Swiss-Prot record:
Binding site for NAD(+): 10-33
Subunit and partners: Homodimer.
Gene Ontology MF, one: alcohol dehydrogenase (NAD+) activity
Protein name: Alcohol dehydrogenase
EC number, UniProt record: 1.1.1.1
Protein family according to the UniProt entry: Belongs to the short-chain dehydrogenases/reductases (SDR) family.
GO biological process: alcohol metabolic process
This protein's encoding gene: Adh
Binding site for substrate: 138
Length: 254
């Protein structure tokens, strides 16, 4: 995908990895970058606008846990304004295994609902032009951090959902791929709660091992966007970008 002159919606594009990715995207010159986030960050938005004044950066308040109908209403507002959207990035996520319901609601259900909502505008069966979905999942979707099983399972679910959307592309015209960061130095991982407090030092233990910066992750994220490979499972770890070959153990045969 050529980012220049495109229209992009980025859910949670003002967070750690999200903000640095937004910076890299803006440098590439899209026509519009629409940021949907729960918390407004005027300083970050102004920085993005100053980084490339030719890019129109807009913000809408959005909580991914709202009902599907509300998400559709918000997207209609955006589509009415832009007419077309090329890429949806789903980046909302929390890491706190004390908040079981919210972890599933944000990390999985929110991704499903936002993707489902945009199908009203993209699905070729409804006369739509198709589109591209990039879902930020996690390497914990491959192999869990077992001390945070709820978080890991929510990311595995999002990864599975993304793979299914990719396989449905011949029917819907909508392609999809997953972005799976390894341990990245963000506020998210500096301190978080393990499930039932099984390991109070889990964040500290993870950060004892090699990590990557948000800038490294963001730069590789943009490379994955540009590659635009339907069904790709991208691992962004230790400053490297790698396409993962998924091992199939079972097939529905349909």
């Amino acid at each position: 995908m050529v980012i220049a002159n495109s229209n992009i919606i980025f859910v949670a594009g003002l967070g750690g990895i999200g903000l640095d990715t937004s910076r890299e995207i803006v440098k590439s010159g899209p026509k519009n970058l629409v940021l949907l986030d729960r918390i407004d960050n005027p300083a970050a938005i102004n920085e993005l606008r100053a980084l490339n004044p030719k890019v129109t950066v807009t913000f809408y308040s959005y909580d991914v846990t709202v009902p599907l109908a509300e998400t559709k209403k918000l997207l209609k507002t955006i589509f009415d304004k832009l007419k077309t959207v090329d890429l949806l990035i789903n980046g909302a996520g929390i890491l706190d295994d004390h908040q079981i319901e919210r972890t599933i609601a944000v990390n999985f259900t929110g991704t499903v609902n936002t993707t489902t909502a945009i199908m009203d505008f993209w699905d070729k069966r409804k006369g739509g032009p198709g589109g591209i979905v990039a879902n930020i999942c996690s390497v914990t979707g491959f192999n869990s951090i077992y001390q945070v099983p709820v978080y890991s399972a929510s990311k595995a679910a999002a990864l599975s959902f993304t793979g299914s959307i990719a396989k449905l592309a011949p029917i819907t015209g909508v392609t999809a791929y997953s972005i799976n960061p390894g341990i990245t130095k963000t506020v998210l991982v500096h301190k978080f709660n393990s499930w039932l407090n099984v390991e109070p030092r889990v964040a500290e233990l993870l950060l004892d091992h090699p990590t990557q910066t948000t800038v490294q992750c963001a730069q590789n994220f943009v490379k994955a966007i540009e590659a635009n490979e339907n069904g790709a499972i991208w691992q962004l770890d230790l400053g490297r970008l790698e396409a993962i070959e998924w091992t199939k153990h079972w097939d529905s045969r349909i």
